[in-house]
Swiss-Prot record:
The gene is F9. It is an enzyme of class 3 (hydrolase). Ca(2+) 8 binds at E281, N283, E286, E288, E291. This is Coagulation factor IX. Residues 93-129, 130-171 form the EGF-like domain. Residues 1-28 form the signal peptide. The active site is at H267, D315, S411. Residues 227-459 form the Peptidase S1 domain. It catalyses: Selective cleavage of Arg-|-Ile bond in factor X to form factor Xa.
Length: 461
């Protein structure tokens, strides 16, 4: 050992030469080849830009991808507040529009922890899920709905009403508006369904052609004169109802159009017979001090009505009164919509009929006004139920099992459909085979075919 130390001390150069020789002889690779060197130097990206590629500028990756940045730091990169805001909405919580939440063709705009749907015409709601065109639920209008030129839903009301503040509902604009029951104790009605169904508002005009289920031109059946199986109405419950007196009292009914005009069935009236109209009537054998009597000074049957050919085709007529009626809670007009909506209301499927006709076939007449709710009968069933002609200006209503119907003496009276508490005239009681017979239905004049004629003839000057 001492010898080694002596050699190292005396010959340091010799030791250095030996160490260099050892290192040069060692098999050690210091440098990597080209392919392996690239694997180390090319680190993986830590952010997949996706939809944000258009925003990647300057030092965005260094500022906001390698570490969390602030809005101000992102603003320094974009140098534009609008583009920074768009980037920031996705950077903070991701793209809220990625799941396509907007329905019915709506476009989505991302926001922080939220999104906004821009809806096309006819749709609204958080996700454009609500269809608000007139075709669906009447555009949420209480009475009438139209699509304006700029594709917006516009609600409107019948005469005597105005739009409420919400621009959807209708409120009375006159003391005694049409179709409203204003006597408080008469509010108990089994109301028809008033929610607008999803209906086709375009196909509301059918051609007036005969549905050829028969070839017979003359008919042998009963004029309706009474509601069978109905209930006693309360005073003022049907304030548009009138009774016609002539050679016989209460031979037909009718409805108040306005202070000067009554609408009834054409087969009820004869131009050579004096007719008296009584409005505000309830019990025809008692004086209740609500009655108003007027004489008829003019009868206008529909111009297509011809009793010699068919007593019940175009079965509608107008009666002009000598003095105007005084409107009150017991004397109120019935509402008459336009052709389109009268047809729509009829399709609701249920209406009220009323009158003082016979309580059963060939039986006694009613003393107190009767009323009955009757369902609309589909046209195919209606045609199969009778051998007589059912024209397109007629419709059937009633019960297959029988027992409830209008009957002799009810003719000319109203078939009304209630819409959100307001009643509209949809039919006129016309004819039927006996009364309340099983498998038979009441036949009514379809008012939608005649509303333009009614309004033209009954204008108040």
């Amino acid at each position: 050992m001492q010898r080694v130390n002596m050699i190292m001390a005396e010959s340091p150069g010799l030791i250095t030469i030996c160490l260099l020789g050892y290192l040069l002889s060692a098999e050690c690779t210091v440098f990597l080849d080209h392919e392996n060197a690239n694997k180390i130097l090319n680190r993986p990206k830590r952010y997949n830009s996706g939809k944000l590629e258009e925003f990647v500028q300057g030092n965005l990756e260094r500022e906001c991808m390698e570490e969390k940045c602030s809005f101000e730091e992102a603003r320094e990169v974009f140098e534009n507040t609008e583009r920074t805001t768009e980037f920031w909405k996705q950077y903070v919580d991701g793209d809220q529009c990625e799941s396509n939440p907007c329905l019915n063709g709506g476009s989505c705009k991302d926001d922080i922890n939220s999104y906004e749907c821009w809806c096309p015409f006819g749709f609204e709601g958080k996700n454009c899920e609500l269809d608000v065109t007139c075709n669906i639920k009447n555009g949420r209008c209480e009475q009438f709905c139209k699509n304006s030129a700029d594709n917006k839903v516009v609600c409107s009301c019948t005469e005597g009403y105005r739009l409420a503040e919400n621009q959807k509902s209708c409120e009375p604009a006159v003391p005694f508006p049409c179709g409203r029951v204003s006597v408080s104790q008469t509010s108990k009605l089994t109301r028809a369904e008033t929610v607008f169904p999803d209906v086709d508002y375009v196909n509301s005009t059918e051609a007036e052609t005969i549905l050829d289920n028969i070839t017979q031109s003359t008919q042998s059946f009963n004029d309706f004169t009474r509601v069978v199986g109905g209930e006693d109405a309360k005073p003022g419950q049907f304030p548009w109802q009138v009774v016609l007196n002539g050679k016989v009292d209460a031979f037909c009914g009718g409805s108040i159009v306005n202070e000067k005009w009554i609408v009834t069935a054409a087969h009820c009236v004869d131009t050579g017979v004096k007719i008296t109209v009584v409005a505000g009537e309830h019990n025809i054998e008692e004086t209740e001090h609500t009655e108003q009597k007027r004489n008829v000074i003019r009868i206008i049957p529909h111009h297509n009505y011809n009793a010699a050919i068919n007593k019940y085709n175009h079965d509608i007529a107008l009666l002009e009164l000598d003095e105007p009626l005084v409107l009150n809670s017991y004397v109120t007009p019935i509402c008459i919509a336009d052709k389109e909506y009268t047809n729509i209301f009829l399709k609701f499927g249920s209406g009220y009929v009323s009158g003082w006709g016979r309580v059963f076939h060939k039986g006694r007449s009613a003393l107190v006004l009767q009323y009955l709710r009757v369902p609309l009968v589909d046209r195919a069933t209606c045609l199969r139920s009778t051998k007589f002609t059912i024209y397109n200006n007629m419709f059937c209503a009633g019960f297959h099992e029988g027992g409830r119907d209008s009957c002799q003496g009810d003719s000319g009276g109203p078939h009304v459909t209630e819409v959100e508490g307001t009643s509209f005239l949809t039919g006129i009681i016309s004819w039927g085979e006996e009364c309340a017979m099983k498998g038979k239905y009441g036949i009514y004049t379809k008012v939608s075919r005649y509303v333009n004629w009614i309004k033209e003839k009954t204008k108040l000057t």
